[in-house]
Each structure stands twice: as C-alpha cells, then as structure tokens.
C-alpha cells in the first residue's frame, strides 16, 4: 500500500472492519455473479476473516498529499525515522497462536491492567484543552482505542503513561499537521508546558519530541 491517498482506495475496507459483527465484514468484489466465480466469492462479495491484520506503508512527505485525519483515527502509524543496521539472527522455531487465543490474551489484559480513572480524567482534560486551543478533538473512536491499547501495552511490560504518550502522539498530535502551524508556535509551546503540568515533567516524551519537530519544521 505504498501510495498516497490511502483513505480513498482503502476507505471501504476501513469502514467494514469497524462493523461490530464479523458476519458483516464483506467486501464487494464484482457486481455480476457467475457460476465459475472463485469459491470464496459468494454473491459477488468476499468474507473477511477475523485473523487478518492489514500492514502497509504510505508516503508522507513534500511530494505527496497530506494523510487524512481519518487514516490516523483508524490505524496505528509506525514511523520509520532511522535506518537500522543489518544483522544476522539464528533460526528459531515458529510459534503458532490462534486468533481465539490472541483475542483471549487481549481480553485478559483488559481485565488485569485496565486504564485508571485518573488517566481517563487527564485525557478528558487534554481533550478539552486541544479543542479550545486547536479546534481538534480525540473523538470516541480514539478513546475506545486507548482503552483497548493501554492494557495490552502494560501486559507487554510497558507503563500506562508510556502507552498514553505513544497513542496521543501518533493519533492526536498527527492531526496538528493540518493546521497553520507557522502561526501557532506559541500555542505549541504552551501545550508542551500543559503536558508537563498534567502528566509530569519527565513524561510524555514522544509527544514533546513531536511538538518540537512541528515547531522546527514550521
């Protein structure tokens, strides 16, 4: 998916994957139905199974269009900002995990490490600040993802504040790219100070690094 305007050609799939019932995860492939259609195409549609994850790359630079907010709303971006050195590794046997088992691990993490009410209250405050200062908002979709993501991050050995730092930087602050940031450097500095007051001075590292990058590039 190394192409610009990912929200155009992947929009239908994104909408389908957000439907609550898996039996609704059907993608229209063809309008005409033939007797010799492939066996997995029924009535011109293909059923998407629950063991499929979509991973792809999109260009986001001066030569392409800006990535739409709804892409960041639905996906978790992983930035490739540095070049890794080549390395050799030993062959290791594969580990097979069923989708049911993986989903059970996710559910167990939510029971064992739920996001704290204190953190939810802080996120509500940040949301109100961002709405007032930048006319942007988290939205219910992102808040649901935070509730799902934070427990799994903690179960993997991280902390609550690290998980919130990552998800806010990747999903909320990315929306700032659509603003006229050249005229908002003072507001960005004030927001940095606000994060220090709300979460602590030595926390929210990814968010503050990204804000500094925005100020530098605009």
Question: Where are the regions a protein language model picked out?
Answer:
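C-terminal regulatory/interaction module of P-loop NTP-utilizing enzymes
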Residues: 1-218
């Amino acid at each position: 998916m190394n192409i610009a305007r990912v929200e155009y050609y992947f929009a239908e799939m994104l909408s389908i994957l957000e439907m609550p019932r898996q039996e609704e995860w059907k993608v229209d492939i063809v309008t005409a139905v033939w007797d010799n259609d492939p066996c997995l195409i029924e009535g011109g549609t293909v059923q998407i199974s629950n063991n499929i994850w979509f991973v792809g790359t999109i260009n986001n630079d001066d030569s392409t269009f800006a990535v739409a907010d709804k892409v960041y709303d639905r996906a978790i971006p992983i930035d490739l900002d540095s070049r890794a050195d080549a390395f050799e590794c030993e062959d290791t046997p594969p580990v097979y995990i069923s989708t049911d088992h993986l989903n059970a691990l996710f559910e167990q993490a939510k029971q064992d490490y739920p996001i704290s009410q204190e953190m939810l209250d802080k996120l509500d405050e940040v949301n109100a600040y961002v709405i007032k200062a930048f006319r942007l908002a988290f939205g219910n979709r992102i808040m649901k993802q935070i509730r799902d993501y934070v427990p799994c991050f903690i179960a993997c050995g991280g902390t609550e504040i690290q998980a919130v730092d990552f998800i806010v930087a990747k999903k909320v602050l990315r929306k700032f790219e659509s603003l006229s940031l050249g005229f908002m450097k003072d507001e960005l500095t004030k927001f940095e100070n606000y994060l220090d007051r709300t979460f602590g001075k030595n926390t929210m590292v990814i968010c503050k690094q990204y804000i500094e990058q925005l100020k530098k590039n605009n």
